[in-house]
């Protein structure tokens, strides 16, 4: 067995969330997030030759929420509470959804045909304050705070959206059931 490190250990690197499609169908490219001088950015890592290509710029890039489309032609990602579709070749992007003021969006899930995305939106003023005890402690505090969360269903082609479910409960990890875009799986977080 041969184990090969893919990233430079001096650079903080994340892979995408485990249910996100982070590799191309042919296994050539892997989506990663790295924190370098310009902050956190998304990159494609060529698994055949090790070449790393930066594909985003600016602040507020979601560190683990990007994913390839089923046909590998589009990369979906989040930046500053906006959700984008990027052409994987040209890197041309367009925003198809923006989270409303006062809310933060996260945990995207895609339909099998990449037509629909589900996300969790959390009302920011219902979250506990970040007092420096970040990390896993924040999970327990967030669960106890019972923040106002909602699951939003977005049509990627038109940008139209609607709230599917809203409650004072911490939601996470939305996934649209394969081949059934009318069923959304999600997590009620906690207790921690």
Where on the chain are the PLM-derived regions?
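Blade-loop segments of beta-propeller domains
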Residues: 12-20, 37-83
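Beta-propeller domains
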Residues: 163-192
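Residue-level recognition of a conserved intra-blade site in WD40 beta-propeller repeats
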Residues: 23, 68, 110, 176-178
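A short helix->beta-strand "capping" segment at the edge of beta-propeller domains
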Residues: 1-15
């Amino acid at each position: 067995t041969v184990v090969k490190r893919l990233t430079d250990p001096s650079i903080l690197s994340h892979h995408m969330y485990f249910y996100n499609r982070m590799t191309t169908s042919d296994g050539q490219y892997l989506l990663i997030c790295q924190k370098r001088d310009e902050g956190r950015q998304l990159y494609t890592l060529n698994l055949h030759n090790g070449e790393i290509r930066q594909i985003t710029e600016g602040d507020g890039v979601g560190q683990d929420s990007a994913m390839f489309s089923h046909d590998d032609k589009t990369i979906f990602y989040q930046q500053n509470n906006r959700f984008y579709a990027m052409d994987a070749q040209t890197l041309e992007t367009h925003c198809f959804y923006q989270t409303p003021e006062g809310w933060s969006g996260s945990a995207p899930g895609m339909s099998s045909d990449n037509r629909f995305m589900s996300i969790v939106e959390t009302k920011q003023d219902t979250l506990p304050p970040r007092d420096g005890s970040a990390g896993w402690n924040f999970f327990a505090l967030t669960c106890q705070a019972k923040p106002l969360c909602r699951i939003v269903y977005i049509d990627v082609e038109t940008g139209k959206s609607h709230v599917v479910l809203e409650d004072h409960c911490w939601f996470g990890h939305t996934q649209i059931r394969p081949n059934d875009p009318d069923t959304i799986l999600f997590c009620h977080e906690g207790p921690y």
